[in-house]
Amino acid sequence: MQDIVQDALDNAEAEQREMDGDGDGDEFGDPRIVIVGCGGAGNNTVNRLYNIGVEGADTVAINTDKQHLKMIKADTKILVGKSLTNGLGAGGDPSMGERATEMAQGTIKEVLGDADLVFVTAGMGGGTGTGAAPVVSKIAKEQGAIVVGMVSTPFNVERARTVKAEEGLEKLREKADSIIVLDNNRLLDYVPNLPIGKAFSVMDQIIAETVKGISETITQPSLINLDYADMTAIMNQGGVAVMLVGETQDKNKTNEVVKDAMNHPLLDVDYRGASGGLVHITGGPDLTLKEAEGIADNITERLDASANVIWGARIQESYKGKVRVMAIMTGVQSAQVLGPSTQKQADKSRRELQDVDSKQRAADDAGAGGFGGAHSDGGQDEVEQENGLDVIR
C-alpha cells in the first residue's frame, strides 16, 4: 500500500508541473465575466479592480458624470444620458439615472452581448447608481447572463438616501439573480478613526476583492475545480447572498480560518437556513485533504439540511503555511435588504409616489382636453441617436 501511495505522490507532482505549464491553454474557451460599475461608487470599485487586476474579467464603467468618468480606469467607459444631464450627473435622482441608462441600452447590450457572468456594482441611495443598476441587470439577464448585484447602502443619518436605497434594492432584487449588500454603517465600527477617504477605500477594496475572488475562482484552474456551471447552480437560487472571506497562518487552520471568515465586518446577516453555498479554499502544498474538508464542513454546518453546497480547493506555492477561504451563501436573511421594516417603508414610499403620479396624470389629462397625457421619447432609435453617448474602449 505504501508503494501505491508513493507512486501516486510522484505522479501527482509530475501532473501538477504539466498543468502549470499548460495553464494558458484556451482551446475550450472560458466564460466571459464582465464587471459593471454604475455611478460614482460603482466606478470607484471598477477603477480599483482595474488597478489590482482581475484575471479573465472585463471592466465597464457607466456614469452620467463626465468629469468623474474621465478619472476612472476601465476597459470600457460609457457616458449615458448626455442629452438629459449634459454630463453633469443625475443630481441624486434615481429616475434620472434610470432613464439615462435606458437611453443607452443599445450600447450596453453590445458591451454585454456575450457575457456569461455579470457583476453589477453600485452605491445605493444616489442618482446614477441606484437608477442604473437595475437597468443594467435587466439587460444582462435578457442577454442570458447570470447577474450578481454587489452594492453598498448609505449611512443611517442619510435619511433621504436611505429611502432611495431601499427602493433601488427592491428593483435590483427583481432583476438580478443574487445581490450581495455591504453596509456603510459598519465602517463606523470597523474603521472609525480612519480619515473618511481612506475609510471609503476600505469599502471599495472589500467589494473589489470579493468580485476578484469570485471571478478568479471560476477562471483559474484548481485542484478540486469550481466552474461556471457550479456558480450558476448556486446563484440561480436568487435572493440575498453573503460573501465570507477568511485567512490565517495559525496552526489550527480548520477552526481559525472559519472564525476569521465569520467576522465579516460589513454585512449584518443570518445565514442559518441559507439555500446554497459555494466554498473555495486556497492553501499551500502543506494543506491536507482533512483540513480542506474540515474547513468546508465547518463553514457550511449552519446551512439548511437541503442546501446545495459545492466546494473546491486550489494549491498555490505562495500560500505555504497559510490558508484562505472564500464562501458565498445564497438565500440568507438580512434586515438590511427588504426585511419587515424595510419592506414596509419601501411599500409606503412607492404608494406615495404612485399617488403623486396619479394626480399629475389626472391634471395632464384635464389640460389636454381628455385625450390623455401619455408621451414618449420617440422610440428607442430616436433616443439612442439623441443620447450623445461617449464610449471609450
UniProtKB/Swiss-Prot annotation:
One of its GO terms (biological process) is cell division. This is Cell division protein FtsZ 2. Belongs to the FtsZ family. HAMAP family: FtsZ. GTP binds at G40, A41, G42, N43, N44, G127, T128, G129, E158, R161, D204. GO terms for cellular component: cell division site; cytoplasm. Homodimer. Polymerizes to form a dynamic ring structure in a strictly GTP-dependent manner. Interacts directly with several other division proteins. FtsZ1 and FtsZ2 could also form copolymers whose stoichiometry is balanced by CdrS regulation. Disruption phenotype: Deletion of the gene does not affect the growth rate but causes drastic increase in cell size together with morphology defects. Division is strongly impaired. The gene is ftsZ2. Induction: Part of the cdrS-ftsZ2 operon. Transcript levels fluctuate depending on the presence of CdrS, growth phase and chemical perturbations, indicating a growth-sensitive mechanism of transcriptional regulation. Transcriptionally regulated by CdrL and CdrS. Essential cell division protein that forms a contractile ring structure (Z ring) at the future cell division site. The regulation of the ring assembly controls the timing and the location of cell division. One of the functions of the FtsZ ring is to recruit other cell division proteins to the septum to produce a new cell wall between the dividing cells. Binds GTP and shows GTPase activity. Essential for triggering the constriction of the cytokinetic ring during exponential growth. Required for normal cell division but not for cell elongation. It is found in: Cytoplasm. Signal peptide: none annotated. Residues 367-376 have a biased composition (Gly residues). Disulfide bonds: none annotated. Residues 345-364 have a biased composition (Basic and acidic residues).
